[in-house]
Amino acid sequence: MFKKFRAIRAGAIVGAAMFVTAPAGIAAQQPASSARPAASGASVRAATRQYRESHEAEIAREFVELLAIPDVALDTANIGRNATAVMAMLRRRGVTTRTLDGAGGPPAVYGELRSPNATRTVVFYAHYDGQPVDPSQWTGAPFTPVLRDGSLAAGAKVIPMPAAGERMRGDSRIYARSASDDKAAIIAMMSALDALRAGGIAPSVNLKFFFEGEEEAGSSHLRRVLQANTELLRADAWVFCDGPVHQSGRQQVVFGARGVMGLELTTYGPLRPLHSGHYGNWAPNPAVLMATLIASMRDDDGRILIAGFNDDVRPISAAEHTALGAIPPVDTTLRRALQLGATEAGNASLAERIMAPALNVRGIKVGGVRELAANAIPTEASASIDFRLVPNQTPEHVRQLVEAHLRSRGYHLVADTPDSATRVTHPKIVRVEWEGGYAATRAPMDIPFSRALLAAASSGAATPPLAVPMLGGSLPTSTFEQVLGVPLVVLPIANYDNNQHAANENIRVQNLWDGIELFAAVMARVGHEWKESAVP
């Protein structure tokens, strides 16, 4: 007779949970026996594939139901519905679950599951909230998921969702907000649990799950949630399931992520618009002031010119240099696909540039253009900027450096709209509004957990995943590292052309299938590989 999987809380058994309950329409299987020998990576993947091929319609249906719930972080009512739905998904798999107080923000969903004979605990992370949407930019309704027979960019058509027992084409895509970022990871985790259960394969580690509800809104309440639940979240390591695969199409194990912080700048000209003929060359133009200010912070090759900005950047280690050299080049292909005649830094590789900090101008607003253009000097100009940070840089220090740079350019800094006295006293004024942010992380690639996770992710794979030092995008990994003090590694599964954060977001179905296999292999193998990787 098979044994039970038990729920855990900070290493203590708090109740029994049968690892047998499947989604509606999927026959429940008995839990795996702890007496069985460890399954090989190849057998785990074969069992996962067999299960998935028999249940593609059921997986798609559960996924689409989750995608249909609007998930913009500031939409409190619908965020609550998402949390409830994710909890129900966990409970259907026998996972003990609860919400963690959001400290004034959206709740985090927590789950726990003990595996027989496991000696280590790993937390799997994803987020259930999504970016805001502008429905006018979407081909279809953002929260009405549709299946297309390929990429919309290539003219793909809407096709029916599969009926029970039907298979899905790997190159078809599901379009909806959060299809790739990050609900694909949630359904892939759930399906991996189902596949392991159906194959009689026990996870090699005790599993915990943490699903955040405000990642896309800056994770402003995350630190307090973690600090209030440190015992509950005690684990040996975290796996962040977010982001895209490599641009070559290969899966990747990523050992860190860049940090991020945002900034809004406003420069000021005359109190009212002035005729450019009567006052041009006399009244300061805020558009020119802003353009000059941006150019003083960043050159055409992406180099950040702010004094001291790069002083604390952590050097690339020998292991990271080796990993970067093994990443397949994609730059020529990407330049062609994106119709770029050249890229920055003398056409340096994308893999290399991701390892450096970046200053991105995400928008500029001033005056009018085309049919709205007027021959006038505008009153103000605004620029929206984001910084991508690398290890050893902190948002606090970057803020100090940026503000010192603005002052060195002769600007008086204000936090709100300047009053009359301020305007007539200071020749150059800039309003500075900082957004929340967090630092970067980069786990060492040669510690036992890093080696074990890479080995588990590679086990049984026809093409092993790439080992990548750092993700170009940002995740709040530093907050977890600072509060919980454990290593974190990222396992992305989305297609790289998923339109993340944009209209017509999508997940390629084969990426979802591959992600289920990847998560199942890691759950089933990482504990065994960890033992073999252990060093004094």
Residue map of PLM features:
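Metal-dependent amide/peptide-bond hydrolase catalytic core
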Residues: 29-31, 37, 43, 246, ...
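A non-catalytic alpha/beta surface segment that caps or lines the substrate-entry region
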Residues: 62, 72-125, 129, 140, ...
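Acidic/histidine-rich catalytic neighborhood of metal-dependent amide-processing enzymes
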Residues: 167-256, 531
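Sec-exported extracytoplasmic/periplasmic mature domains
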Residues: 53, 64-72, 87-96, 194, ...
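Bacterial N-terminal signal peptides that target proteins for export
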Residues: 1-14, 24
